[in-house]
Every structure is written in C-alpha cells, then in structure tokens.
Amino acid sequence: MEHTGNHITLCGTLRALPEYSHSNHERRFFRFELEVERLSGTADVLPVMAAEDVLMAADLFAGGRFLVEGQIRSFYSRAESGRRLIISVFAETVTTTEQPPQNDAVLTGAICKPPIYRRTPLGREICDVMLAVPRQYQRTDYIPCILWGRTAQCAAGLPVGAQIALAGRLQSRGYVKVLPEGAEERTAYELSAMELEILEENF
C-alpha cells in the first residue's frame, strides 16, 4: 500500500451543477455531489468541495461523468443539537472523463479513539475507527473508518495513538438520528477500508 497520507480518486456522475459555498483568501469555493456506482449496483452520493479555478478547467454539466482527485477533509459544525463532524472531498483537480466508476482512497494517520468492535445482526465482524490524519498548517482531519472481517479483528486490538494506513472507498450511509423533537434522517460518510497496515503501535 502506498503511504500518501490522504488521497482519494473518484469517478462518477455529477448530480447537479455546483452551488456557491463560501470564499476564503479571495478564492470562491463551490459544493456539488458526485454519484459513484458500486459493483453491487447501488451508489454512493458524495459531497465534493472545489475552488472556482479548479472547476473552470472542466466543462461541467449535470449528468456528465467526471474524475475528481483530492483529499478527504473534515470539520466540526456547531448546531443547537451539538457538534457534528462534516465530511467532504476537497477536489484538487476535476476533469471530464469516460472512465468507469472509481472510488479509491488511501489514508495514513493515528487512531484517536478506542476502536469499537462489534458484530452485525447477520454475524459480520466490523470495527469502527476514528483516524486523525495530519494536514498542512498544523491542521488535522478526523475521518470515520469502518473495517471488516479479519482486518476488523486486527484493528480492534490496536491502542489509541497507533499509526496505521488504510485503503478503501468513501461510502455514504443513511441512518436515523433520534432527537428530542423527533427522528431525523441523516447521511454518514466513512471510509470502508479493505486494507490495513500497521505502521507504529505506540504502546
């Protein structure tokens, strides 16, 4: 596995034209959703953020196929119901393509919370890991990751602070959040990891 720190490649369908999000250091940023089909036929709908100058390099149109190269980013949003971790793909390049669907991500970082190991109702072994991935300018992206089977068993025994590399795909998953005012449908974004490499355990 190549240790790139934080890299993702997506190839999918643009659901709608990008919408303005915010400006930072005189750069305008836009947000859009890319639909990436899985081999099973279902699709992950993933949020992407890109600077205006990056988008101008591609002839964007709804329903078109585009290749996105970038990083998985996160930030905490404060709301009345508490802090929420917001996940998106920060696009470094966006290009028109005819390639088949692609969703490949590699992350290198440190486990920052005790891994949570459990079995699904169907008996599948899974392990939830929160990975702290360092970024430039002393920033950190916190990326939820889920591991399966034998890799889940391996991750379950790792301590906080262990340095690991993961490879997999970024997936979207719907769930229901129960709030005092009622139930609310939400979407979670997480790395579904197929490969795990332990770099340093830091016991």
Could you describe each region identified by the protein language model?
Residues 1-203:
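Single-stranded nucleic acid-binding surfaces, predominantly the OB-fold ssDNA-binding core
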